[in-house]
UniProtKB/Swiss-Prot annotation:
Disulfide bonds: none annotated. Keywords: Aminotransferase, Transferase. One of its GO terms (molecular function) is transaminase activity. The gene is gcvT. The glycine cleavage system catalyzes the degradation of glycine. Gene3D superfamilies: Aminomethyltransferase beta-barrel domains, Aminomethyltransferase fragment, Probable tRNA modification gtpase trme, domain 1. Its EC number is 2.1.2.10. It catalyses: N(6)-[(R)-S(8)-aminomethyldihydrolipoyl]-L-lysyl-[protein] + (6S)-5,6,7,8-tetrahydrofolate = N(6)-[(R)-dihydrolipoyl]-L-lysyl-[protein] + (6R)-5,10-methylene-5,6,7,8-tetrahydrofolate + NH4(+). This is Aminomethyltransferase.
Length: 364
């Protein structure tokens, strides 16, 4: 039987259509996925992301452990509350998960990992933490609400205490702070400003209702997917998985190659891939009628005249742009155009960087 978050009842009261998402009953939409998408791009929307897993790590060697566990380097984290995005890789350089790490003190770091990968993540972390004597606490006592959009921070702040408002005032992106009952982070999955707010489970329903009263629109998984795709953000299981390198998933920027003597899981495999060459993740835009969908083939002719083929990893109609967009994993050497086979039609597409919308504006 699928699990329910502490906000399940609130979703049904808001008229949600509930679906099973990796073993969790989650809202797909509350009537109109399109309206929810536009609310986040133009005003403020909120998502229940309590199905994600918060993991607290304590111990004097926590930083040392994370420098080995992750491809990005937590040595970069020197300011309290600063966050870092990283892949957690296997020995062959495949992505076990992508996650966010927060630094609080030398013996306290926090991870936020995906729901679909929860069990294997916890198993992997526990297995590798043992030699470092790390105390691992899974925070199932916390709910997580993402409030996103150009007016999201202002509307969310109406629920904060004076102390909380003061703590987040002017806080830069990718920081988090614990004030009272709330852990407030300037992170998100939409390409808009906003907060991801963790709170005790018993406080979540009241907080959700207060956000509704403050004019924040409840949004479901459907809008979350179109928003993240417009923003060029990866979805685990589509853009990357245990058989796909971060180098082939537009995550090269998350690999800290320096210092050269830092050993991290997957480093040797990545160095070989970097030397040999690898696939790349690109954006595709199709302004003609039709929708680019996952797993459609992408064909092009390289500079040497060879026929090459890749695959769409995520595709949709973009509500913000009014045409179809996609992320595709393709062999290196793709030019500015390609062909996508949609049923029995060969459709021309423009090849772009893998990002389409930032802060409500087109960038593709």
């Amino acid at each position: 039987m699928a699990q329910q978050t502490p906000l399940y009842e609130q979703h049904t009261l808001c008229g949600a259509r509930m679906v099973d998402f990796h073993g969790w009953m989650m809202p797909l939409h509350y009537g109109s996925q399109l309206d929810e998408h536009h609310a986040v791009r133009t005003d403020a929307g909120m998502f229940d992301v309590s199905h994600m897993t918060i993991v607290d790590l304590h111990g004097s060697r926590t930083r040392e452990f994370l420098r080995y566990l992750l491809a990005n380097d937590v040595a970069k984290l020197t300011k309290t509350g600063k966050a870092l995005y990283s892949g957690m890789l296997n020995a062959s350089g495949g992505v076990i998960d992508d996650l966010i790490i927060y630094y609080f003190t030398e013996d306290f770091f926090r991870l936020v990992v995906n729901s679909a990968t929860r069990e294997k993540d916890l198993s992997w972390i526990t297995q590798h933490a043992e030699p470092y004597a790390i105390d691992i606490t899974v925070r199932d006592d916390l709910s997580l609400i993402a409030v996103q959009g150009p007016n999201a921070q202002e509307k969310a702040a109406t629920l904060f205490t004076d102390e909380q408002r003061h703590a987040v005032e002017g806080m830069k992106p990718f920081f988090g702070v614990q004030v009272g009952d709330l852990f407030i982070a300037t992170t998100g999955y939409t390409g808009e400003a906003g907060y991801e707010i963790a709170m005790p489970n018993e406080k979540a329903a009241d907080f959700w209702r207060a956000l509704v009263e403050a004019g924040v629109k409840p949004c479901g998984l459907g809008a979350r997917d179109t928003l993240r795709l417009e923003a060029g953000m990866n979805l685990y299981g589509q853009e990357m998985d245990e058989g796909i390198s971060p180098l082939a998933a537009n995550m090269g920027w998350t690999i800290a190659w320096e210092p050269a003597d830092r050993d991290f899981i997957g480093r040797e495999a990545l160095e070989m891939q970097r030397e040999k060459g690898h696939e790349q993740l690109v954006g595709l835009v199709m302004t003609e009628k039709g929708v680019l969908r996952n797993e459609l083939p992408v064909r092009f002719t390289d500079a040497q005249g060879n026929q090459q083929e890749g695959i769409i990893t995520s595709g949709t109609f973009s509500p913000t742009l009014g045409y179809s967009i996609a992320l595709a994993r393709v062999p290196a050497g793709i030019g500015e155009t390609a062909i996508v086979q949609i049923r029995n039609r060969e459709m021309p597409v423009k090849v772009t960087k893998p990002v389409f919308v930032r802060n409500g504006k087109a960038v593709a």
